[in-house]
């Protein structure tokens, strides 16, 4: 029997990481950017507290979640959640069931991320879309292992290759700032994030979301399961 404490309780508790409006904004942005249709069936792998998943549902998608923690059911009991350890088990859904598979800050937590990526491919329908966010090792290497649960870092190149090896097509990987104003006005604010990243001392990160998320850059990958799989 596993007597370890729930990772959400330790790392993502509301004292250290209060609930905010950001997850709903992120879900809405991704729905708009990738033209995800209302009524599409989405699976979030590693949904944590369920905030982004709830954002997708509120945006009109049919959302399901899977995680090692039952925390989503505490915050959003109406959301269908399946609890399992994906380091050891398959995603507990049938082949080709979902139009969209989404994950954020997930694949870096696995010693063998190729296994979970293969499972994401399996549960996507042909033509379905994968969206995955993970820290950019090139700019986060100093802080990456501050999270004890991090296992495998990714660069844009290694993330792209992982998806291509697992038969995804139309693979795109780009740097992504977790700042909604940058999504809305990239030509104005993207250069300012770069200036902040290079000039602001790290000691100020806890005191400014702008400084923190100018420095803590994510990789955003999108990919498609081909209509005819090999």
PLM segments and residue spans:
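A short His-aromatic
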Residues: 105-109
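Conserved N-terminal segment of class I S-adenosyl-L-methionine
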Residues: 1-94, 100-104, 117, 176, ...
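S-adenosyl-L-methionine-dependent methyltransferase catalytic module, highlighting the catalytic core
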Residues: 10-25, 51, 83, 111-123, ...
């Amino acid at each position: 029997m596993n007597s370890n404490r729930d990772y959400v309780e330790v790392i993502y508790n509301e004292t250290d990481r209060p609930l905010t409006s950001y997850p709903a904004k992120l879900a809405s942005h991704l729905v708009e950017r990738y033209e995800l249709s209302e009524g599409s069936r989405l699976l979030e792998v590693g949904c944590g507290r369920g905030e982004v998943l709830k954002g997708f549902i509120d945006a009109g998608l049919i959302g399901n979640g899977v995680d090692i923690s039952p925390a989503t059911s505490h915050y959003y009991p109406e959301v269908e959640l399946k609890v399992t350890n994906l380091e050891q088990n398959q995603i507990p859904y049938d082949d080709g069931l979902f139009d969209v598979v989404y994950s954020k800050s997930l694949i870096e937590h696995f010693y063998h991320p190729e296994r979970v990526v293969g499972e994401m491919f399996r549960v996507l329908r042909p033509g379905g879309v994968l969206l995955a966010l993970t820290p950019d090792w090139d700019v986060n290497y100093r802080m990456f292992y501050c999270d004890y649960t991090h296992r495998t870092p990714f660069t844009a190149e290694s993330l792209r290759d992982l998806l291509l090896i697992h038969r995804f097509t139309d693979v795109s990987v780009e740097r992504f700032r977790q700042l909604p104003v940058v999504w809305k006005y990239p030509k104005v604010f993207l250069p300012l994030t770069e200036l902040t990243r290079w000039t602001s001392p790290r000691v100020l990160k806890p005191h400014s979301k702008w400084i923190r998320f100018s420095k803590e850059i994510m990789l955003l990958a999108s990919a498609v399961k081909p209509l005819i799989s090999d």
